[in-house]
Amino acid sequence: MTSGALPDNPFVAAGMIEDPRLFVGRKDELHAIASRMKGDQPTSINIVGEKHIGKSSLLYYFVLTWQQRVLHNTSRYVVIYLPLRGVDCRTETGFYEAVAEGLLNHVQGWQQRSLQNPWKTKPLNRQAFSDAVKEWKQQGKLPVLCLDDFESLLKYPDKFDNGFYDNLRSLMDSNALMLVVASRKQLDIVANVDHFGSSFFNIGHTIYLKELTTDEAIELSRLPTRSTNGAALSVDEQSHAQQWGDRHPYKLQSI
């Protein structure tokens, strides 16, 4: 968790909110993600929303706070955030290595070598990735991958083909892997447009990210700063932000 002083300007109009103290609302969505992690059959999720609606911030905040929502048997899960627009994720092997790096960061120390070793196979190709995920299942660990900007993979159909997606779907169906995938359009619609035939794109559950509720918008407009005990904006400025922003998180923070 982030500690220390709040920033002078608590509003983050462009980019992802990284300080959890500045994240507001989305309680229903956060609960929905956590509830689908629990149980013997985790359900993968597609988070769908327009640009600047807060998909990245939601995923990142969930990764920081999921233990507060799952509560029981938290040692079963390893939850990571992975922005797919990064250069490292432009090839299939690059994707697997980025996932491995994120997971290994959460299982450090000699006591956890049995969890580390499956991810150190070279090359970490499709088969090695599958074997590592299945080995973790045998050891009682569920990787939960929060994949941001999923459209980035779809730009490279020669690198990420139906076989890649079918393999992910197989791991999901065997309850060895859970994905939380953020995209601007629903995955099954994207698949039709881009002519992907994999059943991966018929993902288990879809959450549509919309504007904030009125109460959440008010809470956002009242965020404090490092230099004040109260809200960063005056009462008049808060009112203007709420009217102009129309409950849209990007607009509310662009005042």
Can you say where each PLM-predicted feature lies in the sequence?
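Short glycine-rich substrate-engagement loop in P-loop NTPases that contacts/grips substrate
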Residues: 89-93, 110-133
